[in-house]
Structures are given as C-alpha cells and as structure tokens.
Amino acid sequence: LDRSSAASDVYKRQELHNPDHDHIAELLHDNEEFLAFAWASSAAVAKKRMVLGQCEKVMFNQGGWKKARQEQQMRDWFGFVPQYLITVDATFCEQASDREFCRLIEHELYHIGVERDEDGEIIYSDMTGLPKHYLAGHDVEVFFGEVKRWGADESVKRLLEISKNAPFVSETNIAACCGNCVIG
C-alpha cells in the first residue's frame, strides 16, 4: 500500500465532507428515518423550468384514508415514513457527471435547514432533544434583469465574492471518492 496515495485518498474524501450538513449526518447515524431518497423517472417542470431534484418535509395534508394510503406508500417504499424526502430525476442522474450529481444532492441537502440561536448554536427541541429542522429557501433568489436595473443587493454581492474563489471540491477529488469509480 502506497501511504502517500492512501493519504491523498483520505484527503480527497475529507474534501467532499461538508460540515454544513453535520446536523443531518448526526441524525442519520442515530435515526435512518430522518431522510430518504427517491428516484423519479423524469424531470418535473415548475414555473416553466426543469426541476431535477426536490427536497420536501414529508407532511400529509389529507385526512382519513388518503393520509393512511400516503403513509403506507412511504412504508412500502422505504420501510418507514421519513421526515424529509429528496427526489431526483433518475434520467438526469444517469448521464450526469460525478460533479453534477454531487452538486445536485448537496443543493437538495441545503434545503434541510437547522434552527440556530443568535450565537449560531443549534437549537434543540425540549420535547425530543433533537435539533430543530425546517425546509430552507435559497440564500440568493433574484432575477438577472432586476440586478441589471437596480444593482446587486448584499446577498448577490456576497455570492459574487464567493464565486471568485476556486471551488473547494475538484472533479478529480469527486472521482476518487465515488464508490463506483473506486470499486470499478
């Protein structure tokens, strides 16, 4: 075993780890029912745009048998009713590069927000002792035309500054950490 190669592989795996999602990983370690993933046979369309993935907090806004059927469908699919469900377009994922796939999954994971206090510490539920989660919106949501006419607000300016830096995760590091690439 080449130690420098092994050390390099460990470094690359660490580079893919995102501490922003530690609150999810910790819950999954103790409770696999927190999150489930599903494949869709095609993209969805919303607001005239293709939707390749969607994260949703699982809620049944039905009563009686409708709710019971929906819960049973989840149990049939996953063996449990998850708190959050991420659905991705299988057709897109099949042809996506490793980078595109990882980015899609990470984007959807960012929608699982964790409540924090004014010091940035995670807020825990008094009843369950678990972190309080919510379905998070996007950090920056603005129209190109709006920025052209009125300029960039603080969130857009921050995004521009961040985008000037090289990404933390390179294509090479993704391939080195991909189970299919490493095993195959």
Predicted features and spans:
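Single conserved hydrophobic/aromatic residue that forms the stacking wall/gate
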Residues: 1-7, 11
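Hydrophobic transmembrane signal anchors and adjacent membrane-proximal interface regions, especially
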Residues: 10-14, 106, 145
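Metalloprotease/metallohydrolase-associated module, dominated by Zn2+-dependent proteases
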Residues: 15-35, 39-87, 91-95, 115-184
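…; additionally, a secondary subgroup of soluble metalloenzymes is captured
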Residues: 98
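Active-site recognition of the HExxH zinc-binding catalytic motif
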Residues: 103-115
